[in-house]
Amino acid sequence: GNDLLGHLGFLKNNIELTAIEILEQAVVLLAPIKDRYRTIVKNLSQQNPNLLLCTVYEGNLVGDSFYSDIAFASKAMVSMFNDIVFNTASTFKTDVLELRNIFISPEDYANPIEPSHLGGKKYSQEILRWVNDK
Protein backbone atom coordinates (compact mmCIF):
# COMPACT_ATOMS: atom_id res chain seq x y z
CA GLY A 1 0.00 0.00 0.00
CA ASN A 2 2.71 2.47 0.91
CA ASP A 3 4.56 1.62 -2.30
CA LEU A 4 1.43 2.64 -4.19
CA LEU A 5 1.22 5.91 -2.26
CA GLY A 6 4.65 6.76 -3.56
CA HIS A 7 3.25 6.69 -7.08
CA LEU A 8 0.23 8.96 -6.64
CA GLY A 9 1.93 11.44 -8.93
CA PHE A 10 1.30 9.00 -11.76
CA LEU A 11 -2.43 9.49 -11.30
CA LYS A 12 -2.09 13.27 -11.13
CA ASN A 13 -0.13 13.36 -14.38
CA ASN A 14 -1.76 15.77 -16.83
CA ILE A 15 -0.14 14.30 -19.92
CA GLU A 16 -2.72 13.15 -22.44
CA LEU A 17 -2.36 9.43 -23.07
CA THR A 18 -4.52 6.76 -24.61
CA ALA A 19 -6.13 4.19 -22.34
CA ILE A 20 -3.66 1.59 -23.62
CA GLU A 21 -0.70 3.84 -22.79
CA ILE A 22 -2.04 4.52 -19.31
CA LEU A 23 -2.53 0.81 -18.60
CA GLU A 24 0.91 -0.04 -19.98
CA GLN A 25 2.50 2.63 -17.77
CA ALA A 26 0.60 1.31 -14.76
CA VAL A 27 1.86 -2.23 -15.41
CA VAL A 28 5.43 -0.94 -15.73
CA LEU A 29 5.03 1.08 -12.53
CA LEU A 30 3.69 -1.94 -10.62
CA ALA A 31 6.26 -4.44 -11.93
CA PRO A 32 9.02 -3.75 -9.37
CA ILE A 33 6.46 -3.62 -6.56
CA LYS A 34 5.09 -6.98 -7.73
CA ASP A 35 8.57 -8.51 -7.84
CA ARG A 36 9.43 -7.33 -4.31
CA TYR A 37 6.07 -8.47 -2.97
CA ARG A 38 6.32 -11.94 -4.49
CA THR A 39 9.88 -12.33 -3.18
CA ILE A 40 8.79 -11.38 0.34
CA VAL A 41 5.83 -13.78 0.28
CA LYS A 42 7.98 -16.57 -1.16
CA ASN A 43 10.57 -16.14 1.60
CA LEU A 44 7.95 -15.95 4.34
CA SER A 45 6.01 -18.94 3.04
CA GLN A 46 9.16 -21.05 3.20
CA GLN A 47 9.45 -20.24 6.91
CA ASN A 48 5.77 -20.46 7.82
CA PRO A 49 3.06 -21.87 5.55
CA ASN A 50 0.28 -20.10 7.49
CA LEU A 51 0.36 -16.64 6.00
CA LEU A 52 -2.45 -14.14 5.72
CA LEU A 53 -1.98 -11.66 2.91
CA CYS A 54 -4.02 -8.48 2.93
CA THR A 55 -5.30 -6.55 -0.01
CA VAL A 56 -4.85 -2.80 -0.18
CA TYR A 57 -7.90 -0.81 0.85
CA GLU A 58 -9.13 2.06 -1.31
CA GLY A 59 -9.01 4.88 1.20
CA ASN A 60 -11.57 7.60 1.78
CA LEU A 61 -10.41 9.89 -1.01
CA VAL A 62 -13.69 11.23 -2.40
CA GLY A 63 -14.28 14.77 -1.23
CA ASP A 64 -10.73 15.31 0.03
CA SER A 65 -9.14 18.45 -1.40
CA PHE A 66 -5.84 16.74 -2.26
CA TYR A 67 -7.07 13.33 -3.42
CA SER A 68 -10.56 13.96 -4.80
CA ASP A 69 -9.38 14.32 -8.40
CA ILE A 70 -7.77 10.87 -8.35
CA ALA A 71 -10.26 9.04 -6.12
CA PHE A 72 -11.72 6.86 -8.86
CA ALA A 73 -8.48 6.33 -10.78
CA SER A 74 -6.80 5.25 -7.54
CA LYS A 75 -9.41 2.49 -7.17
CA ALA A 76 -8.27 1.10 -10.52
CA MET A 77 -4.63 1.15 -9.39
CA VAL A 78 -5.55 -0.50 -6.09
CA SER A 79 -7.45 -3.18 -8.02
CA MET A 80 -4.44 -3.81 -10.23
CA PHE A 81 -2.24 -4.26 -7.17
CA ASN A 82 -4.82 -6.42 -5.41
CA ASP A 83 -4.78 -8.69 -8.45
CA ILE A 84 -1.09 -9.17 -7.66
CA VAL A 85 -2.01 -10.01 -4.05
CA PHE A 86 -4.59 -12.63 -5.09
CA ASN A 87 -2.30 -14.11 -7.75
CA THR A 88 0.56 -14.33 -5.25
CA ALA A 89 -1.73 -15.93 -2.67
CA SER A 90 -2.77 -18.52 -5.23
CA THR A 91 0.84 -19.25 -6.17
CA PHE A 92 2.01 -19.68 -2.58
CA LYS A 93 -1.24 -21.18 -1.21
CA THR A 94 -1.89 -18.44 1.33
CA ASP A 95 -5.07 -16.88 2.61
CA VAL A 96 -6.17 -13.35 1.75
CA LEU A 97 -7.99 -10.81 3.87
CA GLU A 98 -9.93 -8.45 1.62
CA LEU A 99 -9.53 -5.06 3.27
CA ARG A 100 -11.88 -3.38 0.79
CA ASN A 101 -14.66 -5.32 2.53
CA ILE A 102 -13.58 -4.08 5.96
CA PHE A 103 -12.92 -0.38 5.43
CA ILE A 104 -16.26 0.47 3.87
CA SER A 105 -17.48 3.66 5.55
CA PRO A 106 -15.97 7.10 6.21
CA GLU A 107 -15.89 6.26 9.94
CA ASP A 108 -13.38 3.52 9.17
CA TYR A 109 -10.81 6.21 8.27
CA ALA A 110 -8.96 8.71 10.46
CA ASN A 111 -8.01 10.65 7.32
CA PRO A 112 -8.19 9.91 3.58
CA ILE A 113 -5.46 7.27 3.78
CA GLU A 114 -5.23 5.80 7.28
CA PRO A 115 -7.73 3.68 9.20
CA SER A 116 -9.41 5.10 12.28
CA HIS A 117 -9.63 3.29 15.60
CA LEU A 118 -12.99 1.93 14.40
CA GLY A 119 -11.48 0.63 11.17
CA GLY A 120 -8.51 -0.73 13.08
CA LYS A 121 -10.83 -2.58 15.44
CA LYS A 122 -12.65 -4.21 12.52
CA TYR A 123 -9.29 -5.11 10.97
CA SER A 124 -7.96 -6.67 14.17
CA GLN A 125 -11.19 -8.64 14.65
CA GLU A 126 -10.81 -10.17 11.19
CA ILE A 127 -7.19 -11.09 11.88
CA LEU A 128 -8.18 -12.69 15.19
CA ARG A 129 -10.95 -14.60 13.43
CA TRP A 130 -8.38 -15.92 10.92
CA VAL A 131 -5.92 -16.88 13.70
CA ASN A 132 -8.63 -18.67 15.67
CA ASP A 133 -9.70 -20.61 12.57
CA LYS A 134 -6.17 -21.92 12.01
Locations of regions flagged by a protein language model:
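Alpha-helical cap/lid subdomain in secreted, periplasmic
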Residues: 1-117, 121-132
